[in-house]
């Protein structure tokens, strides 16, 4: 049970959501077999890698007040038990991915490589840009969901993945601001810890522009997602105003508000991704 807690159920649900959205956006059917296998891949691969990440970071978790209650630092689970549980989840997830097709298995392998050895073990304690490698791991469920439906990964899948990738800085950096004393105490050089608030705001804005460009480009390429984009754009503009104001106030409440705005923006954009819009109807009529 504690191993399942280590999968970060809320984060797992969000990443699994991106996988299923990509699956249906790619034209995936309601096949119980594929949908069931994708669920096993999500729980096993995403959840297992997340749990393994907690094993690798258990020393940091013990230092930071925000994470000190997690199963390993709180003593509810030994490091060895957590490691075994994580590896079992990953093995099951990878086996399900291999049953679907080799591309889905590849996305799982890449998620593991980018998340554990590259992000967590190599860069997180050394570099402020470590989340870029973590972000690559974060887009793999989207690519895996698309590959589950089609057996291939094309431009639309990469545009959806780019939206997830460019959403991650707003999601992560403002969590860091909210708990910045924890990160300083643990000696983790996240970008908000070592850079000026103005630099972080500019960088976050650049990524937000990429997110908007990628979701709107997805609509132009596929004719899908217009309603989601129309609803998501004003939320992003509102978030942008808060981000640009943040350096003036450096307020924890505002940091939390920005972080909480990030998730709905991505959710709304992705909810519309599988659905055709008048754009595709107009193109059909003009042919």
Predicted regions and their residues:
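Membrane-embedded alpha-helical segments that form the functional core of polytopic membrane enzymes
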Residues: 17-58, 65-66, 90-94, 105-117, ...
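Small-residue-rich segments of transmembrane alpha-helices in multi-pass membrane proteins
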Residues: 14-20, 70-73, 132-149, 198, ...
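Multi-pass membrane catalytic core of lipid/isoprenoid biosynthesis enzymes
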Residues: 66-106, 196-220
């Amino acid at each position: 049970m504690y191993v399942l807690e280590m999968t970060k159920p809320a984060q797992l649900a969000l990443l699994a959501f991106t996988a299923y959205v990509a699956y249906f956006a790619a034209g995936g059917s309601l096949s119980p077999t594929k949908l069931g296998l994708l669920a096993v891949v999500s729980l096993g691969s995403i959840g297992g890698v997340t749990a393994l990440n907690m094993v690798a970071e258990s020393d940091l978790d013990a230092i930071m007040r925000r994470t000190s209650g997690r199963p390993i630092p709180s003593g509810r689970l030994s490091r060895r038990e957590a490691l075994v549980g994580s590896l079992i989840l990953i093995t099951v997830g990878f086996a399900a991915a291999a049953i679907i097709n080799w591309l889905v298995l590849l996305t799982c392998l890449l998620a593991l490589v980018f998340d554990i050895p590259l992000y967590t073990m190599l860069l997180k304690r050394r570099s402020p840009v470590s989340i870029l490698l973590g972000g690559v791991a974060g887009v793999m469920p989207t690519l895996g969901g698309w590959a589950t439906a089609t057996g291939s990964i094309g431009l639309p899948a990469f545009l959806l993945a780019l939206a997830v990738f460019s959403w991650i800085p707003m999601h992560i950096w403002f969590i860091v601001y909210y708990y910045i004393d924890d990160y300083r105490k643990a000696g983790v050089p996240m970008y908000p810890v070592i850079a000026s608030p103005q630099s972080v705001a500019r960088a976050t804005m650049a990524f937000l522009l990429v997110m908007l460009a990628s979701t709107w480009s997805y609509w132009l390429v596929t004719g899908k997602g217009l309603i989601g984009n129309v609803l998501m754009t004003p939320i992003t503009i509102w978030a942008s105003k808060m981000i640009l104001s943040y350096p003036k106030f450096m307020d924890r409440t505002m940091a939390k508000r920005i972080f909480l705005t990030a998730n709905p923006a991505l959710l709304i954009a992705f909810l519309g991704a599988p659905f055709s819009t008048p754009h595709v109807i107009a193109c059909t009529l003009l042919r």
